[in-house]
Amino acid sequence: MKILFHFTITLFVLSLVACNQIKSPEPVKQYAFIGGKEGDKIDTTCFDSLQLSDPFILADEETQMYYLVGSGGSLWKSTNLKMWTGPYQYITVDTTSWIGTAPRIWAPELHKYKDKYYCFVTFTNPKIIVDTVPNRYNVQRRATHILTSDKVAGPYHPISDKNYLPEGWSTLDGSFWEEDGVPYMVFCHEWMQTVNGIINYIQLAPDLSESMGTSTTLFRASDAPWPREMKSIGELTFGMAQEGYVADGPFLFRTGTGRLGMLWSSWNNNRCAQGVAYSKSDKLAGPWVQCNTPLISNNSGHGMLFRTFDGKLLMCLHHQSLDSENPGPRKPTLFEVDISGDEIKILEKYHP
């Protein structure tokens, strides 16, 4: 009888241990396309008719095709820069993650790196508040994530679930840069949270799946002499006059003399403007010296550079009318530029 009793107790204990060792099932990931408009009619239109903020063009040698992306999450493609086919959906995410089912999609970049394609893109979930700054909007969850695909047109999906930057930071406009074989992300710590917008960088893992260490500040928006404080020029952000300096859209390049430069944007008397800074050390770590005046003004900015298949170097950026009553949408525009010397120079507007 004692043996049976001890045997029963032993079985009971073992069953408890087994139960404790059984892990709760992990939530099932649900991947879906986001951005763009599902069901949009695929059509062909001329470049001058496109409406897009934060445009970025990848000239893909393998397919001999140009791929245009921008805020909103749609992709367009072209063989000649003049006529574009789209819009296509190309971004997929786990909708059970913090990104959610309907995030805002800002400033994507497409890059080919080590035989794979990557999309650096900023997501915002307005339902998640990460910080509160007095006299400003609540700070929403906003962060750049890195997606990957075997094909340039996608679909792109997150490399991992890891956060590249602190959850409590509002970060955006992540841009890819490689220096001495090491990959980095250059990004903005948003002025809506910091008041004075900051451009930072952080090292990435070799496969871009995570960040390494902590980020480093390169400069602040007010370090340049040309940006204007937003409230002082009567600029409204989401309908509210807020003090601060904008830092936006970093993009790095190297001149013909090996000088390291950075395109970045802020606001001046003519609203959005395209600025330039140069690294004194010609290394990402800087220090960075700001040009005294914008490269392009008149409500244009968030520029990037790419080379056409026939060798022209072009800058693509968005432009919007200065008409205060009816400015219309932002539209991508192109300029031919020269970086063969020590600095970037605008040659002329480029018409495909």
Where are these regions (language model features)?
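Carbohydrate-active catalytic/glycan-binding domains of CAZyme proteins
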Residues: 19-352
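Bacterial Sec-dependent N-terminal signal peptides
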Residues: 1-28
